[in-house]
């Protein structure tokens, strides 16, 4: 992805390129529990802020450098974090 918008839930892996500016990305709920989504930053320059519709681990996930990766699992209600690569940050629910 090179522009702000919705991350596809129909493909397993999304590659993020923020060299053109800050990205505001959304992630809708998956239709099926057990869906796994991997998001990885392949080209950096700016932050990519990901806001899932329902996120059990916080409110947003921010990536800012090449290699930042998150693996998420949809539990039927919300996205759970299976793993977050070094440097990626979660914003806790206030």
Regions found by a protein language model. Give the residues of each.
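Exposed extracellular interaction/assembly regions and N-terminal maturation sites
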Residues: 1-52, 74-94
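Glycine-rich loops and low-complexity Gly/Arg-rich segments
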Residues: 41, 61-65
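Extracellular beta-sheet repeat scaffolds used for adhesion and glycan interaction
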Residues: 53-61
């Amino acid at each position: 992805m090179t522009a702000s918008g919705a991350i596809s839930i129909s493909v397993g892996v999304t590659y993020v390129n923020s060299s053109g500016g800050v990205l505001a990305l959304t992630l809708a709920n998956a239709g099926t529990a057990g869906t796994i989504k991997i998001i990885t930053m392949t080209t950096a320059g700016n932050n990519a802020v990901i806001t899932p519709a329902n996120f059990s681990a916080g409110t947003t996930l921010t990536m800012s450098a090449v290699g930042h990766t998150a693996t998420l699992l949809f539990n039927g209600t919300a996205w759970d974090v299976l793993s977050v690569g070094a440097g990626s940050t979660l914003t806790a629910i206030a």
